[in-house]
Amino acid sequence: MAEMIEAKNLRNGQTIFGPNKEILLVLENTFNKTAMRQGIVKTKVKNLRTGAIVWLEFTGDKLEQVIIDKKKMNFLYKDGNNFVFMDQKDYSQIEINEKKLEWEKNFITEEIEVTVITYQDEILGVNLPDLVPIEVEFAEDAIQGNTANMARKKARLVTGYELDVPQFINTGDKIVIATVDGNYRERFNK
C-alpha cells in the first residue's frame, strides 16, 4: 500500500490520489489554521490524466501518495496523431497521442529530450525542459521606425506555435522559448 500523508504536510511537486482516485500533482498549497477550527489546506493541483488545474480544500484528511515513474526519452518523429519517443538506454519506443500533449506539442522538435511520466503502465504525459531552442518558420517584417522599447511582432515556429518576438528576429532564426508560458526568452546562441 502507498504511503499516506496528512494534507497539511503536502509539498509542491508531490503526487497524490484525489477524492475520485484521479492522479494529482501538487502545484501550490497553503495551510490556514484558525483558533477554533481545524486547519484548512488550499491546494492547487493538476490532474495528470486530463491536464485540468483546479483548487481543492482539505481539512484533517490523510491522502494517499502516488508513486509515478519518470523516464528520459528523445522525440523521434510524429506518426499521424501520435508522437513517437525513444529511450536512449534500451532503444524501446512509445507513442503518445497528441491529445495528451496539448500544450507540450508546441515545443517538441527533433531530438528534444523529455521526461515521460507514467503510473504503472499508463502514460500520463511529458515534462519538457524549461527552455527549448526552436526555429522561426515565419516572422512578420519589422515596422520601420518602430523603435519603442520592447517593440514586438508576430512569429510562427516550425511547430506551428505563434508568439510575439522582438523586431530583430527574422524567418529562419533560432530562438529560445520558455515552455512554462510559451514566451520568447532570447536569440539562440550555439
UniProtKB/Swiss-Prot annotation:
GO molecular function: translation elongation factor activity
Pfam family for this entry, one: EFP
This protein's UniProt keywords: Cytoplasm, Elongation factor, Protein biosynthesis
Broad class of where this protein is predominantly found: cytoplasm
Function: Involved in peptide bond synthesis. Stimulates efficient translation and peptide-bond synthesis on native or reconstituted 70S ribosomes in vitro. Probably functions indirectly by altering the affinity of the ribosome for aminoacyl-tRNA, thus increasing their reactivity as acceptors for peptidyl transferase.
Protein family (similarity comment): Belongs to the elongation factor P family.
Protein name as catalogued: Elongation factor P
Source organism (scientific name): Mycoplasma genitalium (strain ATCC 33530 / DSM 19775 / NCTC 10195 / G37)
Lineage of producing organism: Bacteria, Bacillati, Mycoplasmatota, Mycoplasmoidales, Mycoplasmoidaceae
